[in-house]
């Protein structure tokens, strides 16, 4: 049995702005709804009374899709959205049949709006009805900017670009409030700043105490390669992993993104953060990185 957990989604408009598919379909849905409403008002004498309920329900569905995308809550509400979309599609297609053959300009406008709404509903059913395993779903997601990056929240953006950065509360518990923590890792020979900079492959270093590298030391490190023993003595702040998850599907990390990790189907991962689309996880071999949340399930 999966252990229930509570997660209060946060509204992030950047999630919508960074997703071209969601932004374009929601925008077209609103435009289609306005056209359908205006045409239906103009052809009210020929418009069936039940059609008004269909328009109201379609507006509710568009609002639901907007909120689900903006709060990054697609997975828990996927089945609900599919049920709503099936009903809304039945309503708008039925209204299309009632107005498209009347011949007046208002009826034609209403029919065009309902046809556009039907197309948008079909696209949403295809997207929300499939998972990342489906090629078309993965292709659509590939256009999303920075894997859930929020453009209007700097703190959220820092978290997404570097899930290993320390929060202020963690820094205070270490006695270094507000101070950036730096470290260098095995075989890399450089200095990685864990305060919001891109990881660049430094995520799999060993555990040690935090320390702030001096400029002279940093310059020296750029001129020589760190040995495994040096990496063992390097300074790094460990992250807690209170959750455990099982891989539902196998995942191959993107070679262009050093932050991702690969894992096999059925593998057990330790997870530190379950918010957002990408979770920080640790494998049994100690490898640390981010994994897509829809590829794993939380364990009791």
UniProtKB/Swiss-Prot annotation:
Segments in the Cytoplasmic topological domain: 1-20, 71-79, 130-300
Extracellular side: 42-49, 101-108
Keyword vocabulary terms for this entry: Cell membrane, Glycoprotein, Membrane, SH3 domain, Stress response, Transmembrane, Transmembrane helix
Keyword field contains Transmembrane: yes
Pfam families: SH3_1
Record-stated family: Belongs to the SHO1 family.
Subunit structure: Forms homooligomers.
Job description of the protein: Plasma membrane osmosensor that activates the high osmolarity glycerol (HOG) MAPK signaling pathway in response to high osmolarity.
Protein name: High osmolarity signaling protein SHO1
Organism per entry: Yarrowia lipolytica (strain CLIB 122 / E 150)
Gene: SHO1
């Amino acid at each position: 049995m999966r252990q229930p957990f509570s997660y209060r989604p946060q509204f992030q408009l950047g999630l919508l702005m960074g997703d071209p598919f969601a932004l374009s379909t929601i925008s077209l849905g609103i435009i289609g709804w306005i056209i359908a409403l205006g045409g239906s008002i103009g052809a009210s004498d020929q418009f069936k009374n039940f059609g008004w309920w269909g328009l109201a329900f379609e507006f509710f569905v568009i609002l639901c899709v907007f909120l689900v995308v903006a709060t990054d809550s697609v997975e828990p509400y996927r089945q609900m959205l599919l049920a709503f979309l099936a009903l809304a599609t039945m309503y708008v297609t039925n209204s299309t049949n009632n107005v498209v053959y009347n011949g007046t300009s208002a009826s034609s406008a209403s029919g065009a709006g309902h046809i556009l709404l039907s197309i948008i509903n079909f696209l949403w059913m295809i997207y929300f009805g499939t998972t990342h395993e489906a090629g078309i779903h993965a292709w659509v997601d590939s256009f999303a900017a920075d894997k859930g990056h929020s453009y209007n929240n700097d703190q959220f953006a820092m978290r997404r670009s570097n899930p290993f950065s320390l929060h202020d509360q963690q820094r205070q518990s270490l006695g270094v409030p507000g101070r950036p923590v730096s470290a260098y890792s095995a075989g890399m020979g450089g200095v990685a700043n864990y305060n919001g900079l891109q990881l660049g492959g430094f995520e799999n270093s060993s555990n040690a105490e935090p320390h702030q590298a001096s400029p002279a030391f940093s310059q020296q490190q750029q001129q020589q390669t760190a040995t495994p023993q040096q990496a063992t003595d390097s300074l790094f702040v460990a992250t807690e992993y209170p959750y455990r998850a099982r891989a539902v599907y196998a995942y191959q990390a993107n070679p262009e993104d050093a932050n991702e990790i690969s894992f096999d189907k059925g593998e057990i991962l330790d997870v530190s953060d379950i918010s957002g689309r990408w979770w920080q996880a640790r494998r049994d071999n100690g490898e640390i990185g981010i994994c897509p949340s829809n590829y794993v399930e939380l364990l009791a």
